[in-house]
Amino acid sequence: MDDRLTIFIISDSLGVTARTIAKACIQQFPNHDNWQFERYSNINNKELLDKVLEKAKDKNVCLMFSLVDDDLARYAQERSEEEHFVYVDLLSNVIKAMSKLSGVEPLGQPGLLRKLDKHYFKRVEAIEFAVKYDDGKDPRGILKADLILLGISRTSKTPLSMYLADKHLKVVNIPIVPEVPLPKELNEVSPKKIVGLTNSVERLSQVRKERLRSLGVSGTASYANKDRIYEEAAYAEEVMRKLKCPIINVSDKAIEETATIILEMIKENQL
């Protein structure tokens, strides 16, 4: 028999949860480096289970079952008793307790935690969209977006884009810089799809100085200069006025608070 200590992870899904539990448990033992794992995924019938148990016969093994099918879990326990294996059924007792408490029979379907539904894909698509079109990288995204955020530097455009992407919205954010022409595509979308973001000059100066320091640059650079920020803010206000888009001052607002305001706007405009 192989003297090494082995944990067999046996699951009718991927077995990720069971492996995480097992790894957490072995940390309690000083010799945990001597343990090894073997994971057997998608073990969803007795024939497959028997093949795994056959492999366990010649090893110093602990079996960890993560089986939601009640019949298969019961069979695994019976076979383990017959072969005198050390084993743990991770799910059966928990599922039975929940069923007893709720009065509802469990579905017995493996992999439900990891099933990818349309909402998941929509969220991922929105996040990828936000990354692709962040900071005006590609103005073509404006015509594809659910929402366009405009603002000068450090007005929370990127974190807002990502937060709203988590709500399944495809968001483009465009920086406003006096010396840089705005994308012509902005004139081709409804003002209701555009939101302008502003901030107080004092707050912008403070945030920009902190940003420069984090980059190892002097806080006296023009980027953080109040006169420069006044110039940018005035230009941005003029742009937003011409576009006739709503404007939100993000000063002293959490990302979640600003996002809630935007979501309410979208709801009102039925976009």
From Swiss-Prot:
EC primary class: transferase
Keywords noted in UniProt: Kinase, Nucleotide-binding, Serine/threonine-protein kinase, Transferase
Enzyme Commission identifier(s): 2.7.11.32, 2.7.4.27
Catalytic activity of the protein: N(tele)-phospho-L-histidyl/L-threonyl-[pyruvate, phosphate dikinase] + ADP = N(tele)-phospho-L-histidyl/O-phospho-L-threonyl-[pyruvate, phosphate dikinase] + AMP + H(+); N(tele)-phospho-L-histidyl/O-phospho-L-threonyl-[pyruvate, phosphate dikinase] + phosphate + H(+) = N(tele)-phospho-L-histidyl/L-threonyl-[pyruvate, phosphate dikinase] + diphosphate
UniProt-listed Pfam families: Kinase-PPPase
Record: residues binding ADP: 151-158
The UniProt record lists the keyword Kinase: yes
One annotated GO molecular function: phosphotransferase activity, phosphate group as acceptor
InterPro entries in UniProt: Kinase-pyrophosphorylase, PPDK_reg
Claim: Transferase is one of the keywords in the record: yes
Family affiliation: Belongs to the pyruvate, phosphate/water dikinase regulatory protein family. PDRP subfamily.
Function: Bifunctional serine/threonine kinase and phosphorylase involved in the regulation of the pyruvate, phosphate dikinase (PPDK) by catalyzing its phosphorylation/dephosphorylation.
Protein name: Putative pyruvate, phosphate dikinase regulatory protein
Protein source organism: Streptococcus uberis (strain ATCC BAA-854 / 0140J)
